[in-house]
Amino acid sequence: MNDLNRRDFLVALGMGVSALTLDPVAAQASPAPGRIKPITGSWFEFQHHATVEGVDWNPSCVRFSTRQWETKIKEIAEVGMEYLVLMATALYYRAFYKTSIFARWDLACADPIEAVLSAADRYGIKFFIGGGFYGDWESDNTITDPVAAKKRLQAVEELTNLYGHHASFFGWYWPDEAFINPHFSPEFIEYVNGCSRLARQLTPKTQIMIAPYGTRKALPDDAYVRQLDAMDVDIVAYQDEVGVRKSKVTETAAFYEGLRKAHDRSQKAKIWADIEIFEFQGQVYNSALMPAPFSRVFQQMEAVSPWVDRILAYQYQGMMNKPGSEAFAGCPASTRLYTDYLNWHSAQ
């Protein structure tokens, strides 16, 4: 689908993309025509880790009841999403479940993990459960810190015992993200494999995912393929880094094409995309996250679709809300992205 056809298509759906213009660079970088993959999942959280970014939904989520968490899961299922990735089971040295590791978060819902997994059982959502943050989430040293590692592994065991009976407990996510520059660090591979070793013992049927950043810097050469072979993960969901302004939608197709070839050579982990459906209200990392216009999100989907098995988004929460929802979490503009995406998805 060329740029002109895409614009005509979106205008026909009434999504207000008059701002889209023909871009010769975009035309040159566009992947081969083909089906645009939908967004089949999203990251999920009880509190956003960067407080300034989550100012529009963190206060609402603190007050969510069990019923509201169920409503939110139902909403997500209604837009065709199948997977949710729970970013954190602990944050800022407080836990979202009952544990001796940390004191619990003071939330209106006594057991939010149970609430969302029970709802996910009902609505057919598959959850990846986050094995973090059991140290300082902003520190690069957390993955090598023996104290944090001990807490992290204790949490994996406790989470299995408490919630492993849920049909929606589909997999694990290791949230201390890697910076690919231009390869994974040995420390990150050791961290991943240590977590995965225990997870395989406790929950052998689950899938394991990571979502590294530095996608634009990745060098998918022989050494990179060997690293993919060495890591015990089932899925690598690469961040497209469009929302954080490190990459442009005209560039990302080439990044994912190279990574696809590396994954095909390795034949071990699946390649998924983690597209950022937000934009910053002001300075990157130091202002509120706002929903991106669907015209841009569509371009992100189009760019990665030929090269990945699935597309996940960062993230539904805060960036998308069903109009009139009793579980509203985010700014008013989030209903526009929800409606525009749902209109597109329903037309497929």
Where are these regions (language model features)?
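N-terminal secretory signal peptides and thylakoid transit peptides that target proteins
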Residues: M1-V17
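C-terminal segment of N-terminal export signals and the immediately downstream linker at the start
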Residues: D23-R35
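Boundary/entry segment of secreted carbohydrate-active catalytic domains
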Residues: A32-I76
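Aromatic-lined substrate-binding rim segments of carbohydrate-active enzymes
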Residues: E70-I73, V85-F133, F188-L202
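Aromatic-lined carbohydrate-recognition surfaces of secreted/lumenal glycan-active proteins
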Residues: F128-E138, S196-D221, A269-E276
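Active-site groove signature of glycoside hydrolases
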Residues: E158-S185
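Aromatic- and acid-rich polysaccharide-binding/catalytic face
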Residues: F170, D176, D221-T250
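Substrate-binding cleft of secreted/luminal carbohydrate-active enzymes
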Residues: K270-A347
